[in-house]
Each structure stands twice: as C-alpha cells, then as structure tokens.
From Swiss-Prot:
Catalysis: reaction(s): Hydrolysis of terminal non-reducing beta-D-galactose residues in beta-D-galactosides
UniProtKB keywords: Glycosidase, Hydrolase, Magnesium, Metal-binding, Sodium
PANTHER family: BETA-GALACTOSIDASE
Protein's recorded name: Beta-galactosidase
Taxonomic path: Bacteria, Pseudomonadati, Pseudomonadota, Gammaproteobacteria, Aeromonadales
SMART domains for the chain: Bgal_small_N
InterPro entries documented for this protein: B-gal_small/dom_5 (IPR004199), Bact_Beta-galactosidase (IPR050347), Beta-gal/glucu_dom_sf (IPR036156), Gal_mutarotase_sf_dom (IPR011013), Galactose-bd-like_sf (IPR008979), GH-type_carb-bd (IPR014718), Glyco_hydro_2 (IPR006101), Glyco_hydro_2_beta_Galsidase (IPR023933)
GO cellular component, one term: beta-galactosidase complex
Coiled-coil parts of chain: none
Amino acid sequence: MLREIVARQDWQTQAITAVNRLPAHTPLFSWRSEAAARDDLASPSRTLLDGEWRFSFFEAPELVPEHWLVEDLPDACAIKVPGNWQLDAAYPGLRLATDVPIYTNIKYPFPCDPPRVPAENPTGCYSREFSVPADWLASGQTRIIFDGVDSAFHLFCNGRWVGYSQDSRLPAEFDLTSFLCGGDNRLAVLVLRWSDGSYLEDQDMWRMSGIFRSVSLLHKPVRHLMDIRVTPELDACYRDGRLKIALQAANGAGLSVAACLYDGGERVATLRQPIGTQAIDEKGAYDDRAECWLEVAAPRKWSAETPHLYRLTLTLLDEQGEPIESEAYDVGFRAVEIRGGLLRVNGQPLLIRGANRHEHDVASGHVVTPAAIEQDLLLMKRHNFNSVRCSHYPNHPELYRLCDRLGLYVVDEANLETHGMTPMGRLARDPAWSNAFLERVTRMVARDFNHPSIIIWSLGNESGYGPAHDAMYGWVKRADPSRPVQYEGGGADTPATDIICPMYARTHQDQPFPAVPKWALAKWIGLPGETRPLILCEYAHAMGNSLGGYAHYWQAFRDHPRLQGGFVWDWVDQGLDKLTDDGRHFWAYGGDFGDTPNDRQFCCNGLVFPDRTPHPALFEARRAQQPFGLTLLERQPLTVEIRSEYLFRETDNERLQWRLCEDGVVVSQGECPLTLAPQGSMMLTLLERLPAFAPGALAWLDLAIVQPAATPWSAVGHEVARQQCMLPAPLSLPVARTPATFIELADGWQIRAAASEWRLDKASGRVQSWCKLGREQLKEAIADHFYRAPLDNDIGTSEADHADPNAWIARWQEAGLNELQHRCLDMVVSPDQGVVTVHHGYFVGDALKLLTRWRHEFDQDGAMRLAIEVQVAAEMPSLPRIGARLWLTDEVLATGEEVSWLGRGPHENYPDRLLAADLGRWQSPLDVLHTAYVFPTDNGLRCDTRQLQLGSIEVEGLFHFSLSRFSQQQLAQARHQTDLVAEGGLHLCLDGFHMGIGGDDSWSQSVRPEYWLQPGGYYWNCVLR
C-alpha cells in the first residue's frame, strides 16, 4: 500500500491539497454537559497525543520500507511531538547534511520549478501507539486533529491509509472511526519536508519540518454539532446587541439546539430552536443547519481597551429535549466597519499600535507553548501595543483566545506567500493554483471565525496580485461581511483590499518603484478618488540597532486621521540556540547550520531578543505609542495638560506622578488621581511657583501616568505613559582658569597639574599619555574618531549574495573612511597660556578628506579642556560619527564599579531614537552599557551627556558617549557575540555628533537627511579630568 500511495506523489500536484480531510470548522470540544462547556472545563471527549513518538528518517519518501506501517524500524529513535525534527537532539539526520534548519527570506530553498519539488525530499516517519475508551468504539465518531504539520503528510492507522493533507499552519482533521480497534492502535505519519504547498509558504523565516503543533483525538456522538459561527452585531447607535448564530449538525433531523449566553455566572439570554432553516431558494431549506439570534440589551462592549467577554453555550437536544453534547465560545460584542475613510470599532476610529509576530522559540523553533504566547502578548500590552498581525500564517489557537481575553486586535493572515516567484504574482495568475490559494483563506476563516479579537482578515503576504486574490477577497466578503479584508500585494491598494496597507512606505518620501509605487503617506491618502484608510502592514524595520525615526511615523499618524497606524516589523529576533565548538551558547542565524541559500542575520528584526529580553528600541515604541499626551502649558504657575487617547475607557486606574528635577536631583514631587473620560483632557496646576535653579543647571519636569492597581496584563504601579519637559535655568558665567605647568621634551611636551600628568607627542600631535596619581589612564593616544561598526541598516542589503552600492557601508568604503592616513599638520604650544593647538589631516592617498583643529587647554586644577573643529571635504558621504576615541586602561574602572552620567538614558539611545531616553542622573555596570545584538554592531550610545564619571575619569560638556570592552574594529569583524574577546582596557567613544541609525527599512538609506553628518564644518568640546 505504501508504495502505491507514495507513487501518486500528491505532494507535487497543486490540484490535490488534501484527501479524506474533514471540512474546516470552528474549534469543537464535545462537552457532555452544558455546565462544563460554560466553565470551559477539560473535555473528556478530547485526548492529547503529544509527547514521545518514534521517529525514523529517510532522504526521500520512496525509501521508506512498507513494513514501517505496522512496526517501528530498527533505527527508530524517540522524538518529541510537537517539535521540529531538525532541532531534536535525538534526530539522526546527519546522514543528510542538507537537512538542517534553513533561513531564507525570499529565495526558495530548492530549485524553483512549481509544482515540482526535489526528489531528494527529507522524510520524517513518525509513529506511536494509543488506545481509546471502549465507549468510543461502541458508538459515535472518533477524529484525529493535527494542528500543524510542515509541510505535508500522509496518515496511516493500523496499517491502513487514512488520508493526506498540506497547509502547515491550519488543522488537518480525519475520521478515524473505521480504522480503530480495541487495545493498542498504531498511528504512522509520513511527513515530507517539501511539497507543492511549499511554493505557497515562502515566508521570511526558518524552514523546518515536522509535527510542530499538538495532535489530539476528539470523540463526537453519532448526532453532533459540526460547525458553529457566531457573529456579534450592534445597532446603529452601538448600544444594543444581537448575536447571530449559524450552526450545522450531523444527523440533525428532529433535533433542536439550546443557546445560552452568560455574563460571568449570570445567564442573560436563552433560546431553543429546532434544526433546520427557512427556504433558501426554490429547492427548499437546509435540514442540517440552523440560524438563530439572541437579543441583548446594552451589552458590555469588547475592545482592546475593554475586552469584556460573554460565554455562549450551544447544546444539541434530542427529540425528548435531553442533551446530547455541548459546545461553547467566548463572545465579544463589537462592530468593525470602515466608514468615512476610517477603520472603526464600535464607532470609534482606531489607531493601530501593532507588531508583526512570527511564531518562534529560541530552543524549539516553530513550537510555541501557550505560556510563551502569553509572555509575548503581555509584553506587547505592557509596551503600549494594541494589535498583532499573524505574520504570515494562522497562528496557534491559543493566541486568539488570549487576545480575546487580554485585549489585542488581530489581523489573521492566510498562510500564503510566493515571494520567491518571478514575477511574484505568477501563481496567482495561474488557474491551476486557484483552489490552493482559495483554500488557504477559506479554511482560516472557518477555524477562527468566532474570535472577537480578529478585526481584519488578510489574504496573505507578498504573493503579487492576480485573479486568485480577487476570488479570495470575494469569498471572504460574502462569508463574513462583518470584517474588512486587507492585502498588500500588487501595490497595497488593489481592489482586493479594503485598507491601503503598504509596507515600508515613508512619511516624507515617495518611492516610485515600477508597477508598485510607494507614495509618501500623507500623499497616498490624498490621491484622487482614494477614500480608504491607510494602515502600514509592515514598517519600522527593527533589525539590530534600529528604529531610528520612529517618532516621525507617530507624529504623522496623529496629524492625519486616515493614517491609522501600522505593524512594526517585527516582534522577535528569530535566532536559534546553538553551541560553539567549545560549548558556549549563541544565537544562530542564516548560514550557521551550513544552510544554503541563506540570508544571514536578516531573520533578526525583532523588538525583543530571542529570549524575549527587550531591545532598547522597544522602549522607543512604548513611548511613541503611549495612549496619553502630556504637555507643559505654563511654567508660572506650573500647569500641564493631560489628554487621553483611550477610545472606550475612563481613567479609573490611572494616577499622575510628577517630579521636578535639577541636575538629576528631585527638588519637588507629587501625585494626583486622573479623572478623564474617553478622549478627554484636563489641566492640572502642579506648583504655583517654580523654585529658582542654579546657574547652568539642567532642570526638567518628569510626568508619568501609572496604574495603582494590577490588571490582567500589568502589575501594581505599571507605567502607561511618561513625558519629560525641559525648564529654563540661568546661564552660568565662565570661571577664571590657571594654566598648568609645561615642560618641553625632545619628542614632546609634559604637562603637570594637580594629580594629573599628560604627555603630548610632537610627531603625531596627540595626547599619548595621561597619568592620575601615578596611574596610566591611556593604552594609546587620544584621537579623532569618524567610524562606527556598521549597523544592519548601514550594511543595507537583505540579500546574502548581492552588494548594495548605495548602502552606507559601501559609500564609506568608497570614500576611504576605513583607510584614512593621519598626518599632524602643525602644532602650536603656548605654555604661558596653557594652550596647545594642533591641526590634523586625514588623507586618502594625497587627497585631504578631513581636517581637524584641536585646541587643548590644560588647567592647574587637573582639567584638559578640548575644543575641536572638524572640516569634512565636499566629496565625502555623511559620516557615521564625529568625535574622539580613548582606549583606557583597566585601572580606570575598579572591578564592580559602576559608570554614572548626567544625560539621556538609562537605555541605549541615538540622535534619531531618543524620544524615550529621558535626561537623568543614571548609573550602570559596564557590561550593561553593551547591547548584545545578535549580529554585533556599534551599540550602547548615550546622547546629550553633560557629565560622565568613569572611575577615576570625569568628562564634562555636551556629548554622546559609549563605553565597551570591545573596539569598533572588533565589533565590525565579529559575526556573533561569542566572537567578541575583551581586548584589555576600555574603549570610550566621545562623540560631538553621531549620524542617525535609520530604520524605515534595512536595505536602503533609511536615515532621514536631518540626521546625516553632511560635508561642512563642525565644532564640539568637552573637559577631561
């Protein structure tokens, strides 16, 4: 039998997507009492088959022996289900060196020849024994449900073929009733790594295989509920509700259904209705279906802010009114519509604070547990996200249940992407693939229909545009008129989308690509005849050290009502845990498993690291998206305005806390409750008079809105919003200075003052030694610094085998920034004034590219005052930084001693990503100043610093700084954090100016021009003590 089944090669026939698979439906549990269904108790009718299975591997399905159907093979090993076999420690797949995790963004991981896939098609053979209760065998129907198998599989039970399925992200359900026997039953599942379905699953993610979601058995009585779709409706005033229930029953003649709606423990609506419908057409009515409505006066509404849920139970009753089985669903009363060019929930226009989320676990790959899903969603809620896009496939069922309960809007997306096709829409225009396309959305809608959190259906991602999408759109709009549909392919504004949903369109700049232009956002919504809302399905590419310019998007969203937000790309770095040869853990990306083709670290685009530790960029997103506006109105008296962006919630759990600070020291503080209606505002006077601030001081007002009580997603004292408002202080007067003592040497100058002694080298013009209390502070001379270890956004290309000549790294290399030759052009020493002035030239060949003038003032109190002018040649590109580098000795910072600074913090920040980095007096251990991005780059900058205390060294002025055990050169050469080796000493970068990091995308020059360091003149200064 196995030979005949394999010989059919269903897995490379696009017209065959399944054989004997049951129709898709909403989740079923077959509770045998209405009370159990109401209380969501474990159902005895459902049994999990997760756990240890047996596993054998073959290089192709044709090599699997026939007798595997009835007995395990000698080489079979234990394997965990759910799991990806490439990540299972017991997997003996080293026999096929290419069967490893593969990361590729666009390219198919095999030759592109649809619907054919390679003959060398890794095949996993899963098996296990199970038994079922005797009463299951006696009557009713026993089903098996595979929640997710990648990419296709044949199912056998007790040596007999049951069926076939593909589409790795939706359930495959089969009727096992006729295959079962008493005692032990044997399941055998032949899983193929590649299938024609793989051409439709070309998402930007790791490609791995296996039974990666749960497997379960479900027993249903002979007469049972087959499918139930629940549609909440609100009247035109969004006050009263009605619940439409459409259901289908097997063998339903003479039966009836009882529906009960509960609000907590209170029953609020009931009805009983016989199975059967009114006449549908001239041929009559359905005898296995029913439609009914529950009227509910003034129900509590569901939204992401107020996720109130009712519980609906449906009980199938026999002719005598006795219960047969019950099903139940969480219900949220909410209305989704597009009206007046705006996406609305319950009449109010939304602002989508969204994230794209892949299902990814650092250890188990595509296997995500309910606890891990909850961790992600709680982090999102705590960082002011209100929406999640299931990119790019239907998710684990638990995600939707939790979004219903915690309060997050969901874009549910079909498992469809053909990014690697040329043209991208090739398959969408081929009628032979139409059914495969359509089925991907119809089955998703069937499974997820009842979740109130789902407010938008998505037809998939990056699959071009063709008649298949029109068919998908038309089917969804007919099957579910209660939700809009979106689809980005074909230019983001085709007839197959209700929402303009571009990816990586910019606030300020047109990108006129052929066939699929991306207009500047405000321009797009103003195009003639365009009335749809615009919501970015992807924006702010958070790859490594990124998210520069994020605040500009949020200013645009608030300035233009039809710009209704978007979904950051993306939530988590898709790094996988791997060991170095010497046993150290690191996060692997494309190529680290020997996988080809690969797109390197392009899988690491997250706001959180693989272990869910936040990137510094996550704090920027939280601040930009916060649901309150806080504005300083007047200084005398100190008056602020608070504006709520909540659409549905009153501020019943929010208090305002405020602090008045001078140079980081709190001089006054207080708090008060907030009583704001939804979208309301209020003014508060905090102080009648401001205190007098010291001359030259930094003074500011910190405002924070906190929740005094815990919520289902936050702890006591959770901070929802924060704002810092600068306050004026008198200017300080310059202090008279006394020059230090100068001693001329043969090759330089020695300067002594207080506890410090410096040596200037005549040949280089640089400070090459600095002793304090007899201890050397420098490992090499202080020098100009113009380079940074390239960021992912600087590298600028997502393709592993293409260089991008317009990328910043390429432009810097072309300009010779990596090979500048230094010459001291002149040095003028004025001992009586305590001043040394040096001109430095930086050349590529004979061409002068950079000219700097360093004015050193050495004071008797031990201070070296630096005033630095920089002239950048006209032909140079924007520089990454303009500053100075100091390689300090280890003695500068004692073991365990912390670094403190007065400036922006506490987390890493850059000139175009500092909205959330408040001024303060911060302290941090040295190692915390280093941000360990999966792919090492420049990191750890702190901007707008006035004072830096680094052990024995103090720096004053206005500068940015970073401090690391690793040089920029080592960071530039490393590929993983485990490649970094402490070089001895500390690398201190003091920057007068630093170019932005960008982040609109990671494959073009995404740094906004106002954050470039253009050719021209620059001046900065600082004081070293």
